[in-house]
From Swiss-Prot:
Keywords: ATP-binding, Ligase, Nucleotide-binding, Protein biosynthesis. This is Glutamyl-tRNA(Gln) amidotransferase subunit A. The gene is gatA. Its EC number is 6.3.5.7. The keyword Transcription does not apply. The lineage of its organism: Bacteria, Pseudomonadati, Pseudomonadota, Betaproteobacteria, Neisseriales. Transmembrane segments: none annotated. Heterotrimer of A, B and C subunits. It catalyses: L-glutamyl-tRNA(Gln) + L-glutamine + ATP + H2O = L-glutaminyl-tRNA(Gln) + L-glutamate + ADP + phosphate + H(+).
Amino acid sequence: MTQYTLKQASVLLQSKQISAVELASAYLAAIAEKNPALNGYITIDQDKTLAEARAADERIAQGNASALTGIPVAYKDIFCQTGWRSACASKMLDNFISSYTATVVQNLLDEGMVTLGRTNMDEFAMGSTNENSFYGATKNPWNPEHVPGGSSGGSAAVVAARLAPAALGSDTGGSIRQPASHCGITGIKPTYGTVSRFGMVAYASSFDQAGPMAQTAEDCAILLNAMAGFDPKDSTSLEREKEDYTRDLNQPLKGLKIGLPKEYFGEGNSADVLTALQNTIDLLKAQGAELIEVSLPQTKLSIPAYYVLASAEASTNLSRYDGVRYGHRAAQFGDLEEMYGKTRAEGFGSEVKRRIMIGTYVLSHGYYDAYYLKAQKLRRLVADDFQTVFARCDLILAPTAPTAAPKIGADSSPVETYLSDIYTIAVNLAGLPALTLPAGFSGGGLPVGVQLIGNYFAEARILGAAHQIQLNSDWHGKRPE
């Protein structure tokens, strides 16, 4: 029962061939068996899950269910939900029980979705391996010696391991797309402002965006329909008419113009990634799409620009964690200033501290113009590059990551780890939508994904193209043993 896609489970629930309680119970049993080794979930509450499932069954019986009623979903630990611990995988918030619910979570609860639990992540979403968690690393379900990617590694791992039909992630510099690639699932980062950020703990406010993660593009489209929408509680939420993100699922690929950025197809990619890209290019050509070479010249500069800006925003956002009102507080201190220092030294992990220090430095007097202001100018140039390309094509095809998932504990420097985000970061700098879908496997049997990038508000077109690729391939149907 846990092998169904979201769409398949929805059909069975609506036709009463299975009940929401049966479906939730099957997932809870699978989680109890497999999660201790995987470490994808860090909070489970069976009583709450089954209570939501019973309510969903009542709604289905009364005939007022939606396509998502009774479908279980996992939430990255960054989303607040009343009565659930929302720790952001940090010691700082290990004892924080949320008193309110994020708008995007509430939207899914209103549809009758059933909460399975909270998934592991890099602390405060800072990282791309899921090793920076207070609760320990999540394993890649395809090979437990490898990372699942990050920061939404727990969400990607539980969907790939069939411990959830769908999950929510957040994407600041690739945190939905990169773990989706490493775990062999589909995930989309929508246009900035499409999904409310209210109740999603902030890392870098001008980059963060929530998105769905599932087995297929069709499942992601169904989820995004429920997730997206204007929210007056979020000042960056976009006031637009409600969209149907499933509307282009049946649009053929014939005639679609796909750009191939030459900067993304260079020597930095492993042979496995280039093979996955070629698989996708061959499929697109066979379906009648037109492929053209394009250029995104600021690609290499996107990494320093991103890490300056995101760290600056993080240092500001994380200043609220000081031990005064909630979260961890140092046990022994002499005065208020010492309490602040000890609390933050004890509560934050090393990567979070590193980014706070970088951010504080680039915002400090004498360095603001040299770093922060220059990075903002670069951000605009990156966005302009994309607009030049989208004048010539409908979508961009690119790698998601330069390699398949690295090993847990790989001896990489912070800079080497940051460089692995080279193909995802520019999308966040520009605020564009982008989706990752499975496109092959490495020689070692690890999944490899590719990325479809669209212009602002082109989610339906991206999802439609991804769905057509998945109708003509079976990479998304593969699952770990």
